[in-house]
Amino acid sequence: MKSRATQTKELDMVNGPLARKILIYSIPLMFSNLLQVFFNMTDVAVVGKFAGARALGSVGSTTIIITLTTGILLGMGGGVNAVTALHMGAEDYQRVHKTVHTSVILCFIAGLLLLVAGLVFSKPLLEVMNTKPELIDGATAYLMIYLCGSPALALYNFGNGVLSAVGDTKRPLIYLSISGIINIVLNLFFVIVCRLGVIGVAIASIIAQYISATLIIRFLLKTYGSYGLRMKDIAIDRDAAAAVLRIGVPAAIQYSLFAIANICIQTSINSFSHVVVEGNSAATNADSLIYDMMAAFYTACTSFIAQNLGARKKERVLRTFFITLAYSFLMGLVLGVALFIFQRPFLLLFTSDDAVIHYGQIRIGVMAFVYCVSAFMDNATAAARGIGKSVMPTIIVVMGSVVFRIIWLLTVFAYFKTLQSLYLIYVISWTLTAIAGNIYFAYHYRRI
């Protein structure tokens, strides 16, 4: 096998100044996440501007379900990332090789299962969420087409997990940029020229997903060394599969249950008028923007902690935890304040309807200054995965951010029935989950 320096030429995570290296590692991830959000926002903006408020509401009504399915694949990718990084840190390149060739099968199967589930359950799920009758046909069409891209998204997340684990966060950014630009061009063509509305946006999205997956898999097939992909070696190794699934499945379950709690919230929002639903849909684009920018540091947290754990450098594990927490908190705070200041121009990107903008501003007014609180929760979860713990963090998130939210909806929101009482659910659940998650990480860090 090649030496570590040859294989991880982009970044050595176990030596050198952590703060600078974490930032270098995270910046391409931030741009990747920012581009991904920008391309998703372009979908919504094109629909809102050229297909009308009803089409905007249709696409917005699918956001939680898409987040759920994407979260499952992100969870699997997170498992690939953590296990690969651990073995890279330990310089166990044979296990890296087995992890990569096992994971590609696991992720692809997950993508296929989501595709089938999407085709079968899209409309029933939207009906359970009390989607407005005037929106459900467009929402169903968009969702069913969009989920046909699940296998491609699964393979992209696999490749991204592998490359991030070995310190390469630049190539995924390049591939995402290429596919994203194509996505924008196709959006405009299908919606404005072909007048396909939400269907056109969905088709453009899945074409872009397959392009990004093709690019990243093509690179791995041409890469030498332990993390390169070889068709003849693709097979499931039981130990590698168990290691990836031990982290990936709880993470996927966490994302799924978290999204289910948000489905309950969306159902509550759907109890208001369609104008409120559309305003909320426009404002939630900020959620993706801010969360995903912060998430770059969580990926760094898991990767750096796993590699340094593998290299038996315990002091760098704790320093990584605090550095990524500081970075993610500041990112959430700065972006939240900027959103509050520029809330109207932001909402005008998606709609020109004053009533819709008004209800979007209500959501932003509550959320803008509390996004940063989520850093304490998500960073602790990422750190726990980095040290190989995923089941209990999932249970903590389920109790604090799923069960608690459902109880809140059935009690506090049911009593007040205001948007403010609904939106406060986020910061309170984040705080409770963060307290438990940080206690858990601190306990297990001492036992490393």
Kindly label every feature range from the protein language model:
Residues L68, N183-N187, A213-I217, L289-D292, ...:
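Hydrophobic transmembrane alpha-helices of multi-pass small-molecule transporters
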Residues A51-I64, T140-L143, A202, H274-L289, ...:
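Small-residue hotspots at the loop-to-helix junctions and early N-terminal turns
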Residues G77, I145-S164, P172-N183, V201-I216, ...:
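Short runs within selected transmembrane alpha-helices of multi-pass transporters and secretion channels
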Residues F38-L56, L126-P133, F189-L196, S256-L289, ...:
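Helix-terminus/linker motif at the lipid-water interface of multi-pass membrane proteins
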Residues I24-D43, I145, Y156, S179, ...:
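Transmembrane helical elements of multi-pass membrane transporters/channels
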